[in-house]
């Protein structure tokens, strides 16, 4: 049986009752090509002098790695001329990126975290790209930040690429979740993980335990119960994982189950969380829900949150449905 490439898969989906518009198909393929280029740069590492700091900072006040800038440029350059987009937005840029006047404009908005987990680059741990696609509001020809401020339920597609021992693109456009592995010999993403599902039950959790003293009471209660293992109220043992790369954590969870948590904490009560809603929380929540899992901010479904700014932050609890529902219930009981 012949292998199914990303291009073939998308074309076949387009033919099935027209569930995937041609312009959206082309946009997803273009994002995939940009991710291939990022993968090659990440893999070269010190050989291409792409490790270390860039000497600049992003809108979040974070020091940029060289590969943050390189990945951001790859995504901008690959997508600006294709005719599918009205504008783009990135973790690395304060304002939306407008399509240059010499290129045709399309009906979609693309948002991305070009290189999630980039603090891991220099120590050779998996990093990744996260992206979200929305429709541009009808009649808008020069999108502003306001046009991006749509709830996650409005996403028409989302995905991530994990750059690890293999490079994998994981994608949804509202009809399940499918994983594609990069065949470097042929330069194509190939369908290797069709219809991915998150197990409902799990014995693994991912959280940065060093911040425990700053957590709200419901999070401490939930984690302490898991740490108590068989002798505690849960009656079974759990294992903890922490990679400090959201893409790597989510990929593990979608592959074998688990819960990923990045709660708000007391160090800065004005911030709703650490992760960004529009290009981290929303796309990952869309993917996890399409795979049968759940995603909340501790109080409500992440996809239902109406954003108020492009770089808005959010607390994140996502993964196996049973665990996400439990920690969310603990938050509601605390109110």
Swiss-Prot record:
Catalytic activity: beta-D-fructose 1,6-bisphosphate + H2O = beta-D-fructose 6-phosphate + phosphate
A GO molecular-function annotation: magnesium ion binding
Pfam families reported for this sequence: FBPase, FBPase_C
Gene3D superfamilies the record matches: 3.40.190.80, Fructose-1,6-Bisphosphatase, subunit A, domain 1 (3.30.540.10)
CDD domains: FBPase (cd00354)
Cofactor note: Binds 2 magnesium ions per subunit.
Subunit note: Homotetramer.
Official protein name in the record: Fructose-1,6-bisphosphatase class 1
Species whose genome carries this gene: Chromobacterium violaceum (strain ATCC 12472 / DSM 30191 / JCM 1249 / CCUG 213 / NBRC 12614 / NCIMB 9131 / NCTC 9757 / MK)
Source taxonomy: Bacteria, Pseudomonadati, Pseudomonadota, Betaproteobacteria, Neisseriales
